[in-house]
Swiss-Prot record:
It comes from the Eukaryota. One of its GO terms (molecular function) is zinc ion binding. Zn(2+) binds at residues 83, 86, 135, 138. It is found in: Cytoplasm; Nucleus; Lysosome membrane; Early endosome membrane. Keywords: Cell membrane, Cytoplasm, DNA-binding, Endosome, Golgi apparatus, Lysosome, Membrane, Metal-binding, Nucleus, Transcription, Transcription regulation, Zinc. This is Lipopolysaccharide-induced tumor necrosis factor-alpha factor homolog. Residues 101-123 are annotated as: Membrane-binding amphipathic helix.
């Protein structure tokens, strides 16, 4: 018979591999545990000590609540607001002081010829003065209103 292709005859002494091992042969059997020694009693054996390590404690976090008060525009009239100093609800107390508008009005009157004391009239008119707002309870300055 003639062989075609790259087939070669089986060499002499070659054995065909056998089937895989059976399930019993393939599973590994663990050896049994050794029996307890006669001198040892399982009831009296103590477990190794259980060491508990303390959990590291974090310092408590303190939260500070900050109330942001919107900038209040102050005018020449009393304003009802919460005092930043004593935290009470108040109506501001007004104090008038001579500001730039009073001095410019005085200078303008001097230029017009009102030298004989009439140029001091702007210092008597509250609507030409700057206004300071104070807390009536703690007397803290809460803000100012500048005319110029």
């Amino acid at each position: 018979m003639q062989t075609s292709g790259n087939y070669q005859p089986v060499p002499i002494g070659f054995t065909v591999p056998s089937a895989p091992p059976s399930y019993e042969e393939a599973t590994f059997h663990h050896p049994p545990y050794p029996p307890l020694h006669q001198g040892m009693d399982a009831k009296n054996m103590s477990n190794p000590p259980y060491i508990v390590q303390p959990v590291p404690m974090q310092p408590p976090v303190t939260v500070q609540t900050v109330y942001v008060q919107q900038a209040m525009t102050l005018y020449d009239r009393p304003v009802q607001m919460c005092c930043r100093s004593c935290n009470s609800m108040i109506t501001t107390r007004l104090e008038y002081s001579s500001g730039a508008l009073a001095w410019l009005s005085c200078g303008g009157l001097c230029l017009l010829g009102c030298i004989g004391g009439c140029c001091l009239i702007p210092f008597c008119i509250d609507s030409l003065k700057d206004v300071d707002h104070y807390c009536p309870n703690c007397h803290a300055l809460l803000g100012s209103y500048k005319r110029i």
